[in-house]
Amino acid sequence: MGVSEMTDKELITITIDRYAELQRIKQSNGNHENKELDYSIKLTIAKLSYLGVNVEDITL
């Protein structure tokens, strides 16, 4: 069984999906502070930026 590598398109799609999930969680949290969630969102934004994705277009 060989190791399959992920294409850039697959990586971008998975990372966008992750960002969308985190945004939905943040939105459903209301005004409750969640530092771990905020940090996860920041990391995901950094990854998407590195991959050339403009997150302003996909932010809730």
List where the protein language model places each region.
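Short, charge/polar-rich alpha-helical segments
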Residues: 1-20
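Short, charge-rich amphipathic interface segments used for partner binding and complex assembly
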Residues: 14-60
